[in-house]
Amino acid sequence: MSEPLDLNQLAQKIKQWGLELGFQQVGITDTDLSESEPKLQAWLDKQYHGEMDWMARHGMLRARPHELLPGTLRVISVRMNYLPATSAFAKKIKNPKLGYVSRYALGRDYHKLLRNRLKKLGEMIQQHCVSLNFR
């Protein structure tokens, strides 16, 4: 018989794994985001989502994770800086002969980078808790 899962210990491991994968911050919350839903709707109503039409079509799923993936118990959120501390970016922007491109547009597509790291984090969690799924 296996030991019962210590959820606090698991949360600490998930946060540590996230840091090891290069995320600057990892947060874990439950799925009741009802307090945030009116703020999200107001943000969408003001069209702050710009050309991201999928946000208007499916934005409320962000406030209702249980509708996105039935059976969801927790939401894990991560943060990753676009501009590494070791970047020589500050020196480059002082050069009047250079044009500027947003940091997120340089190099590898950050969506792919995040997706790959999140997949690795999900796999690490699944190795530790085989009965859990992730998306």
What are these regions (language model features)?
Residues M1-R135:
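Auxiliary alpha/beta "docking" domains used to position bulky ligands
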